[in-house]
From Swiss-Prot:
Subcellular localization(s) per the UniProt record: Secreted
Biophysicochemical property: pH dependence: Optimum pH is 6.0.
Domain of life of the native organism: Eukaryota
Keyword Transport: no
Residue ranges occupied by any C-type lysozyme domain in the UniProt entry: 1-130
Main location: secreted
Gene: LYZ
Name of the protein this chain belongs to: Lysozyme C
Catalytic activity from the UniProt record: Hydrolysis of (1->4)-beta-linkages between N-acetylmuramic acid and N-acetyl-D-glucosamine residues in a peptidoglycan and between N-acetyl-D-glucosamine residues in chitodextrins
């Protein structure tokens, strides 16, 4: 499913991401935009470590989920990576909350560091009926 921006914002808010671990809803929407363009079905294979990034937040199979093919995977979220590709983003949000609790916080996402960190991320939810 490809979410519209405000639709994604509403879902993320409903699932408790606004203010989670000190990050605003705008941070999460900005990150999802630059990671997957709000596409829950997005996958990207990383040749270097043979891992794959999954879903709206592009969560990686080396650390966070099990896809049965990533060498030395940790599965810290305790889920199948396929759960992260569903139209319903509940599992992706639960796992993203686990990711952000790590010391790196949202720095775990290259897109957040590059496009959202230190920026006015409120623009990502402007005009959305939340």
């Amino acid at each position: 499913k490809i979410y519209e921006q405000c639709e994604a914002a509403r879902e993320m808010k409903r699932l408790g991401l606004d203010g989670y671990d000190g990050y605003s809803l705008g941070d999460w929407v900005c990150t999802a935009k630059h990671e997957s363009n709000f596409n829950t079905g997005a996958t990207n294979y990383n040749r270097g470590d043979q891992s794959t990034d999954y879903g709206i937040f592009q969560i990686n199979s080396r650390w966070w989920c099990n896809d049965g093919k990533t060498p030395n995977a940790k599965n810290a979220c305790g889920i199948e990576c396929s759960e992260l590709l569903k139209a319903d983003i509940t599992a992706a949000v639960i796992c993203a909350k686990r990711v952000v609790r790590d010391p790196n916080g949202m720095g775990a996402w290259v897109a957040w560091t590059k496009y959202c960190k230190g920026k006015d991320v409120s623009q990502w939810i402007k005009g959305c009926k939340l």
